[in-house]
Each structure stands twice: as C-alpha cells, then as structure tokens.
Amino acid sequence: MNNTIINSLIGGDDSIKRSNVFAVDSQIPTLYMPQYISLSGVMTNNGPDNQTIASFEIRDQYITALNHLVLSLELPEVKGMGRFGYVPYVGYKCINHVSVSSCNGVIWEIEGEELYNNCINNTIALKHSGYSSELNDISIGLTPNDTIKEPSTVYVYIKTPFDVEDTFSSLKLSDSKITVTVTFNPVSDIVIRDSSFDFETFNKEFVYVPELSFIGYMVKNVQIKPSFIEKPRRVIGQINQPTATVTEVHAATSLSVYTKPYYGNTDNKFISYPGYSQDEKDYIDAYVSRLLDDLVIVSDGPPTGYPESAEIVEVPEDGIVSIQDADVYVKIDNVPDNMSVYLHTNLLMFGTRKNSFIYNISKKFSAITGTYSDATKRTVFAHISHSINIIDTSIPVSLWTSQRNVYNGDNRSAESKAKDLFINDPFIKGIDFKNKTDIISRLEVRFGNDVLYSENGPISRIYNELLTKSNNGTRTLTFNFTPKIFFRPTTITANVSRGKDKLSVRVVYSTMDVNHPIYYVQKQLVVVCNDLYKVSYDQGVSITKIMGDNN
C-alpha cells in the first residue's frame, strides 16, 4: 500500500472517540410476519350522484397492522361498432374518493385526483393502473360483433401515509374493524369514444368488480404508540374565479394550487386523441392527421360533403394558395389526369368581430407534399410543414361553433365530424391536454390577512417538480421537510385570535387573445391543504386534528 496512505492512518489521533463505520450493533426486532391478503367488497349505489361505492371490511384477530393497499379492477370485453379506448391510467381515473375508517370515524381520506397526483412519479404504479397500448389506443369496431377491447384487469396502488416507512408507519388495528371505502367515477369519465359507439348500452352493462389487497402484519407483543398523519383537504373555486379559500386551517404541512378546465356536459368532444402515446408530439401528430384528409382533397370535381360555408379552392400549377396574408404550398404527385387537387382554406375558423383578426387553422399549414394512390383513393402525405401546437389540439369542438364566434367555425366534412371523440378525462389540468400552457401569471397566498407568499413566476411549480420528481403543473408550498415518522411534522400554525385560521389563494390569469377559442375554455382554481392529525390507539383507532404546536 502507498506510504502516504499508510502514514495518514498511523498518524491519526487515537484519543478521539470515533463511531464504527465498518459495523453496526444488530438489534432484534419485534417478532412479526407479513402476508398478502385479498378480499371482496360490498357494492352499493349510494354515492352522491348514484355513484358506485365499494366497502371492504378488515377485521381479523390475527392482523395487527396493515398498509400498501392495492385495488384490483376488472375491465370487461368491449364489443360493437365505433371508436373506443380507455383513458390512460384508467384505474386511477375510475376512483372518485377513498376513505379508511374505524368505528370512531374516518381516519384518512383522499380525492381520486389527489391520489393520482401522489403516485404520478411512480412509473410502476402508473403502468399497472392501466397504461398500455391495448387499453389506451383508440380501437375500431366495424360490425356489432367485433371485439374492440379484450377483458383486462388493472391494479391501482392506493398510496397512504401508512406506507411511508413500512412497519413503523403501518396502520395498527388495535382490535378494531377497519373499513376501506372506494367511491367510483361515472363510466363516462374513463372511456374515449365516438358518436357511433353505443355508449348507453355499454354504460348500463358496465359493472365495477373490485378486489382489495393489502399487506397484513401478524405481530407478537406489539407496542402501539401514537403517530402523525397528513390528510389532504381539497377546495374547488367557482368557475372562472381567481380565488379559493381553505378554512379551519390549524396545522398545515403544505398547500398546493392548480387549475382545471371545466368543459360541462356539451364541451367534451374533441377532434383527435393519440391514445397510448402521450407526448406532446403525439397529440399534435394525431390532430394534424385528422385534419389533412379534409384539408387537401383529390377529386374529379369540386369536393362534396362539406357545409356551404366551406371555402375550397383548386390548387394552381405552381402549388401556391394564398389564404389572407399567408401562402400555402401544396404538391401532390401521381394525380390522375381527370382529377385535381383542392385546398380547404377555412377548415376551422374563429373570430369575435367581423373584419378583424381571424384564427384560421388552415393558415397554420405552410407546405404539404404527398402522393395520391389510385388504388386506395387516398393521399399518402410525405412532408407537412405547420405551426399546429398543443393548444390547438385541446380546443373543444363546441367552441368552433359557439355563439361567440361570428364566423361559421367548423367547416369540416360530415365524415370527419363523425370521427370526433368524447373525452371526459376527470384529471386534466390547465387548459391544454399536457398542461403545458401556464395560465397563472401571479400567485398570492394569505394566511388570515397577512401575505404568506407571492410570486410572479412559476418558482413554486419548479420546486414541486424538483422535490417530487413529477411534472403535473402543480404549484406547492411545503412547510415540512422533517424526516417522516420519527418526528412530528413541521406545520404552519394558526392563531385564531388574530384571524389566522384560513388560507386564501388569489391568482392572476395569464393574458390571452380573445380571438383564440381556447380563451373561452372555462377553468376552476383548485387548492389542496394537507392538515396534520394525530393517530391514537387508546380505545380503538381514532384521529385528532392538531390545533397548534403543543398538540
């Protein structure tokens, strides 16, 4: 060994007390044995809107503690005609609400969307929850007996505070009956389909078939001690209002803010959807592909099947078509002599005043080349130059035809309109499918009357992405970085006498062009506050809301 290294060790001061870094004293743990346990639930339709509810009762004299809940859901075979697919992560999106209760009341509960948000950085959990090409790609049935989707089972990891440190954080039963209750979303929230698919029949025949699994621990001579858990509480603001308030905030570990689109019952139809492939490019490619069949037409005369307001022109010899202040180059090879190439110059249009700015999707294409196939009667496109973005793909069809639009907005063919898709994904955030457009330009949080935090940039969103390793567009203020389980979490603490017992959030929405249809997508502000509770096991399992530093 090198002399310098040897001398650096020999010359060390032996009088200093040092910790052993080459060995540790092993401790004998509590005697326990874990087991995977599964059970069926009792199904009812007692939800707020006749939603399906599954209740799972856990009471076994040999189960001392439990954690790591997994919900199994069977998806049926889908047969019939039309286009159909399940939303990505369909298992999570089936869930509206989860609660864990004892005879003393609710111990912990969470909304389905917040459960999904908590698991968004767990790729394995997301994969098993129903993220596959078989489930999520849009499949087509051509006859009533066609199988559109094979039956499948998805597995939803229900992440709870009892999973943080395995045995330490597990929920101790304390000879109590524990009930896990899952409220499900309507079936319309979890499927993507076109108007030709018989959704009414599918909805009537669809039955949620869940099974709950968990890790149960049999423990010998268990010594149960009180612990702390964080319980999320969600407040949804009024439509298009920039404020939301969480009341009765006494000890909070974090506060999260995001926006959601509100489409209503008639605004959830869209032109395209990519299915399993969920990158921004996939959304844009799917949208462009849908538009091209209506945009460039090879025909032996003026194209038919379009509304009277459609402005379709024949492409001249030089291939250049002028649309207002823009030029589009079109070159289609192998066109038969008796046919011509046409360009649709007002495919989708929007404007709030005549003779002012017009948002025209046709103008967003600058060059289109391809080859016409006489055998298939279709054009194979080779090169498309365009400026279509994720916002364009996220515009509901209804906005093109809304009363705010002074133009005949949707000039597509009847055949194309029939392929539009109903998308009612309950967990979409922001105003576009990928939540890329940051529509909050300023955020202010008040605790009582005092300004707790304000920002003119997205720094709270950046920190949330860095700390959680997820990209869900949520802005989060975290008040607790204390290691879990072994310490009481740090909280922002109320002072009721001074009015400090509510968190008020106000945002300033980003400026958008009123002539862009996306401006009219309604939105809601969502605020999620994590309250701190103490779990006690004196007489069964019960929780107490922390009211200050001394609890």
UniProtKB/Swiss-Prot annotation:
| Keywords for the protein's UniProt record, in alphabetical order | Membrane
**Localization in the cell:** Membrane
* Induction text: Expressed in the early phase of the viral replicative cycle.
Q: Which GO terms describe its cellular component?
A: membrane
**Gene3D superfamilies the UniProt entry points to:** Adenovirus Type 2 Hexon, domain 4 (2.70.9.10)
- Keyword match Membrane: yes
Q: What is its main location?
A: membrane
Tell me where the signal peptide lies: none
**GO biological process per UniProt:** response to antibiotic
Q: How does it sit in the membrane?
A: Peripheral membrane protein
Reading the lineage from the top rank, the first entry is Viruses
Explain the purpose of this protein: Scaffold protein which forms a transitory spherical honeycomb lattice providing curvature and rigidity to the convex membrane of crescent and immature virions (IV). This association occurs concomitantly with viral membrane formation. Targeted by the drug rifampicin, which prevents the formation of this lattice, and hence virus morphogenesis. In the presence of rifampicin, irregularly shaped membranes that lack the honeycomb layer accumulate around areas of electron-dense viroplasm.
Family membership noted in the UniProt record:
Belongs to the orthopoxvirus protein OPG125 family.
Q: How does it assemble?
A: Homotrimer. Self-assembles to form a layer. Interacts with OPG158 (via N-terminus); this interaction is necessary for OPG125 association with membranes.
Further facts: Displays structure similarities to capsid proteins.
Q: What name has this protein been given in UniProt?
A: Scaffold protein OPG125
Q: Which organism is it from?
A: Variola virus (isolate Human/India/Ind3/1967) (VARV)
